Design a protein with these regions (language model features):
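Soluble "head" domains of membrane/secretory-pathway proteins
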Residues: 2-20, 25, 36, 40-46, ...
Length: 184
């Protein structure tokens, strides 16, 4: 075997190792980036309750924007993902009231600051379910309700939700495909 053949084989071996190292590094970087995005920017959420029925059904898959409330304040009407001490499970609810707002419920309807809410998305009537109304939301808290009002575990039972428990905002439905689109 000539010296050129030995050098050629060593070169091929080094090339193969370099190629493997580059692949491992590339795949590792992709996994790290995907995990960072999943944990800190956008995530997938699955609807597991019927409390948003009419708007969201069990089994729907959503894209959650976890940066929404880092750069801006929550807004009335947002569909929020809640993960905090208020509940043992992650919840998906509609944000109804912000700090300083007064919530009232009369004759199955919701009133916000004395004005009846127009809620085309709401299914069923809304009763206080043990909540003393009218009720004023404290600073750093929000009031949430499920759209399926008669079958929802929400602020009527749990109390207000801390800003810190708002994991993110549901922005896009990705499953089922025929319902793909922005969530309102």
């Amino acid at each position: 075997m000539s010296t050129d053949d030995k050098q050629s084989r060593q070169s091929a071996r080094k090339g193969w190792r370099r190629e493997l190292r580059e692949w491992v590094l590339s795949i590792s970087m992709a996994v790290v980036i995907a995990l960072l995005i999943q944990n800190y920017a956008f995530a997938q959420a699955e609807v597991r309750q019927s409390s948003m029925s009419g708007t969201l059904e069990e089994g729907h898959r959503l894209v959650e924007d976890k940066l929404s409330y880092v750069f801006s304040e929550p807004k009335r009407g947002d569909i929020v993902i809640i993960d905090g001490p208020e509940s043992d499970v992650r919840l998906i609810k509609r944000l109804i009231a912000l700090p300083g707002d007064t919530v009232d419920m009369r004759e199955g309807l919701v009133y916000l600051n004395g004005v009846k809410l127009e809620e085309s998305y709401a299914k069923g009537q809304t009763f206080p379910a043990g909540l003393n109304v009218p009720f004023t939301v404290e600073e750093g808290q929000v009031f949430v309700l499920g759209d399926n009002r008669e079958h929802s575990l929400d602020s009527r039972q749990l109390g207000t939700i801390s800003f810190e428990s708002l994991e993110g905002k549901a922005v896009l439905r990705v499953w089922p495909l025929q319902k793909f689109g922005e969530i309102k």
